[in-house]
Amino acid sequence: MNSDLKSFDKIEQKIGGSRKISNYIIGGMLTIGGIGFLLASISSYTGRDLLPLGNPSTLLFIPQGIIMGAYGVIANLLNFYLWYLVYINFGSGSNYFDKSSKSIEIRRKGLFKDIEVKLNFDEIKSVKLDISEGFNPRRRIALVLKGRKKPLPLSGAGELKPLLQVEEEGARLAKFLDVNLEGLK
């Protein structure tokens, strides 16, 4: 974000989606594991070793081969779903704030369609910092809207920025929108 947002009329924030290194690593492990389990199941059924390691042809097809086949099918279904999310870059998008027209556009890439939310500045009650530490930490910026109980998150899911950076971005955005900042303790 820009350092002095009061002097600018527009802000555009890019939000990263599911194309993260962790998703590539998990997808690769699921691919290898799922194919391995399916090959072990087929090997136990046909009696021929299709894997370079081990000796899966000696496994009994009932129950070990069937169970390994089920694990392989489940892993490959999860694998297909994860690679599809990475392919479409699920959750990516942008936040666009325009001071001259007093409008806000929030765009995200959904599972089957794009999601777009358009708001006016007068619909904003405040900017909220949602910060929780511990086992599953969360640091995000959200807009509190008038007449709505749940805040509208602006930062991407799973995005863990340093605490100071989140506080500075929240303060700058609240100053730009000319609303209060909530969530600081």
From Swiss-Prot:
InterPro entries tied to this protein: PSI_Ycf4_assembly
Assigned protein family: Belongs to the Ycf4 family.
Species this protein is from: Prochlorococcus marinus (strain MIT 9301)
Primary site of residence: membrane
HAMAP family associated with the record: Ycf4
Parts of the chain that traverse the membrane: 24-44, 66-86
NCBIfam families linked: PRK02542.1 (NF002712)
GO cellular component, one term: plasma membrane-derived thylakoid membrane
Protein name, as recorded: Photosystem I assembly protein Ycf4
Keyword terms: Membrane, Photosynthesis, Thylakoid, Transmembrane, Transmembrane helix
Domain of life of the native organism: Bacteria
One Pfam family it belongs to: Ycf4
Membrane-topology annotation of the record: Multi-pass membrane protein
GO biological process: photosynthesis
Main function: Seems to be required for the assembly of the photosystem I complex.
Protein location: Cellular thylakoid membrane
